[in-house]
Amino acid sequence: MIKRRINADELELEERVVQINRVSKVVKGGRRFSFSTVVVVGDGKGHVGIGMGKAAEVPEAIRKGVEAAKKNLIRVPLSGTTIPHEVQMEFAASKVRLLPAAPGTGVIAGRGVRPVLEMAGIKDVLSKRYGSNNPINVVKATFKALSALTSLEEQARMRGMTPRELNLRRMRREPAPQEA
């Protein structure tokens, strides 16, 4: 399956800085300071990307992060205002679990998870973060979880069903038919 790269110029992307971190390198003459940023971009309609930027000045680090995020865009399948199914993913020591929620619930998420979900256009979702709360790892785990989502149509195709049959089974919580 070949993934097509999403053209960022065709989308109206918003950007949000998740973290700005001052880092230092110790050299013979003292410390050299620079800045590291984590940036999330998205159009609020199912496209989201994350990027990291490093530079001597904050605006330059943010610009580099935005450029990296635009090169790293993915399409997130939405089911109305929420996600199509539960997903759990980990990155390093951070684990993120995302659950679909009823309309009107809102984005129940902490720092690191919330900006990624909001930039993707997800309005109703429950989330739980386990393990490390390092913002970089949490953002990457969330991004990985969103990229693992499959649409209702794709799930039905994989199971040899129509989306309507799959949805009806979910609503009734019927077990899959057993073959003799």
Swiss-Prot record:
Pfam families: Ribosomal_S5, Ribosomal_S5_C. InterPro entries: Ribosomal_Su5_D2-typ_SF (IPR020568), Ribosomal_uS5 (IPR000851), Ribosomal_uS5_bac-type (IPR005712), Ribosomal_uS5_C (IPR005324), Ribosomal_uS5_N (IPR013810), Ribosomal_uS5_N_CS (IPR018192), Ribsml_uS5_D2-typ_fold_subgr (IPR014721). One of its GO terms (molecular function) is structural constituent of ribosome. The keyword Cell membrane does not apply. One of its GO terms (cellular component) is small ribosomal subunit. The keyword Ribonucleoprotein applies. Keywords: Ribonucleoprotein, Ribosomal protein, RNA-binding, rRNA-binding. Residues 13-76 form the S5 DRBM domain. GO terms for biological process: translation. It comes from the Bacteria. NCBIfam families: rpsE_bact. PANTHER family: MITOCHONDRIAL RIBOSOMAL PROTEIN S5. Belongs to the universal ribosomal protein uS5 family. With S4 and S12 plays an important role in translational accuracy. Located at the back of the 30S subunit body where it stabilizes the conformation of the head with respect to the body. Part of the 30S ribosomal subunit. Contacts proteins S4 and S8. HAMAP family: Ribosomal_uS5_B. The N-terminal domain interacts with the head of the 30S subunit; the C-terminal domain interacts with the body and contacts protein S4. The interaction surface between S4 and S5 is involved in control of translational fidelity. This is Small ribosomal subunit protein uS5. It comes from Roseiflexus sp. (strain RS-1).
